From Swiss-Prot:
PSII is composed of 1 copy each of membrane proteins PsbA, PsbB, PsbC, PsbD, PsbE, PsbF, PsbH, PsbI, PsbJ, PsbK, PsbL, PsbM, PsbT, PsbX, PsbY, PsbZ, Psb30/Ycf12, peripheral proteins PsbO, CyanoQ (PsbQ), PsbU, PsbV and a large number of cofactors. It forms dimeric complexes. A core subunit of photosystem II (PSII), probably helps stabilize the reaction center. PSII is a light-driven water plastoquinone oxidoreductase, using light energy to abstract electrons from H(2)O, generating a proton gradient subsequently used for ATP formation. This is Photosystem II reaction center protein Psb30. The lineage of its organism: Bacteria, Bacillati, Cyanobacteriota, Cyanophyceae, Thermostichales. It is found in: Cellular thylakoid membrane. PSII binds multiple chlorophylls, carotenoids and specific lipids. Keywords: Membrane, Photosynthesis, Photosystem II, Thylakoid, Transmembrane, Transmembrane helix. The chain crosses the membrane at residues 7-21. GO terms for cellular component: photosystem II; plasma membrane-derived thylakoid membrane. Residues 22-30 are cytoplasmic. The gene is psb30.
């Protein structure tokens, strides 16, 4: 369904930056 696809895209769009942020915090780049 279109709704399912939009939900997956939204989750990836939100999770992507969060994962990058967490990795940056662990490495101490901030």
């Amino acid at each position: 369904e279109v709704i399912a696809q939009l939900t997956m895209i939204a989750m990836i769009g939100i999770a992507g930056p969060m994962i990058i942020f967490l990795l940056a915090v662990r490495r101490g780049n901030l």
